[in-house]
UniProtKB/Swiss-Prot annotation:
It is found in: Cell inner membrane. This is Probable diguanylate cyclase DgcT. Binds 1 Mg(2+) ion per monomer. Pathway: Purine metabolism; 3',5'-cyclic di-GMP biosynthesis. It comes from Escherichia coli (strain K12). Homodimer. It comes from the Bacteria. Keywords: Cell inner membrane, Cell membrane, GTP-binding, Magnesium, Membrane, Metal-binding, Nucleotide-binding, Transferase, Transmembrane, Transmembrane helix. Disruption phenotype: A slight increase in motility. No visible effect on curli production. Coiled coil: none annotated. The chain crosses the membrane at residues 8-28, 46-66, 75-95, 112-132, 149-169, 196-216, 220-240, 255-275. Residues 29-45, 96-111, 170-195, 241-254 are periplasmic.
Amino acid sequence: MEKDYLRISSTVLVSLLFGLALVLVNSWFNQPGVEEVVPRSTYLMVMIALFFIDTVAFIFMQLYFIYDRRQFSNCVLSLAFLSCLIYFVITVIIIQQIIEERLTSSVVQNDIAIYYLFRQMSLCILIFLALVNKVSENTKQRNLFSKKMTLCISLFFVFGGPIVAHILSSHYESYNLHIAELTNENGQVVWKASYVTIMIFMWLTLLSVNLYFNGLRYDIWNGVTVIAFCAVLYNISLLFMSRYSVSTWYISRTIEVVSKLTVMVIFMCHIFSALRVTKNIAHRDPLTNIFNRNYFFNELTVQSASAQKTPYCVMIMDIDHFKKVNDTWGHPVGDQVIKTVVNIIGKSIRPDDLLARVGGEEFGVLLTDIDTERAKALAERIRENVERLTGDNPEYAIPQKVTISIGAVVTQENALNPNEIYRLADNALYEAKETGRNKVVVRDVVNFCESP
């Protein structure tokens, strides 16, 4: 988990530094003559960067919802990022209009401010709806809104919000909402404090509610905390636009970009971690937590198909008279015996050896880079450890001593398929059990001749 986090964080950091360098270079070569304004090309670059970041976040959250449909809150959270995408597209179109000199700077700045206000409100409200669903999922309580109603409300803010913002923009003068305007000095933008205060209050409320219910756990909702906290910071900066227009804009947009990148890292790490857990569950035996039969055969297939000529060994182990243990002491004790034997085998083999449960009381071990003599010595050590440590040992709470029989085959040929190799090891195990149990039979595949 930590390695994935470091790799993704490093990639994001390099991308961020590269992006900031492009913005600074662009601003340097596009310095205005009289007005102290942000170059429109720089504005476009930032909007496009935020667009792609939110696109990645939207896709990841949708995939995570498809992966686990019980987490409906992830679906609502993905719609929050989708709403941002719509507003970013509209903002880019508006900026293009002023570049083509279709509208005055004052009108365009006010329209941009309107869509920014609605983008912030939609993002905050949709995240809040997702949070409400998450709390109900965690507490198993009935949600205030049904999933269908929540989805309808979310879709209204995703698609209805831009329509309302369009009506309140310069396209309809009778409904035009005046949020920001250019000052007479240096063309700086001044926001009305009341609208900024509303946004700050909404984000502070969301931040407080999220911290109350989710705390600072390392999961997706930790990313929501980052979004809300940074939104408070860069919206507070709007209050100082009248005095420090350009520098404040760069600071606020940098905070927003960094916060979105941080959230993307958190989302990716969380989702990759969840997928790893699922994969691990699919490959593990639920009782012993060692690998299961399917994983063992997959690894055996890979090993047998390898072009390397290094010898490897397949061991099959079986607990002697295990049915008698179950009949005498019951299945719970039988399960404890299985876990005890697994623990002893795990401590007896090498760190790189693969241990799996291939049957009820049967276990398989795949060992690489080992010859016949070393395989026989290792198998004997395993057998002796099981016999010795299960007798009168307070470390293992089992009522009687148990023994195991081991059959093994060593080969370095890749002519045999996995089933044939396993069958040879199983035949060696059969020989060990038929000739007295509690013993080891190891065969080299070249010298092992089966009876017809």
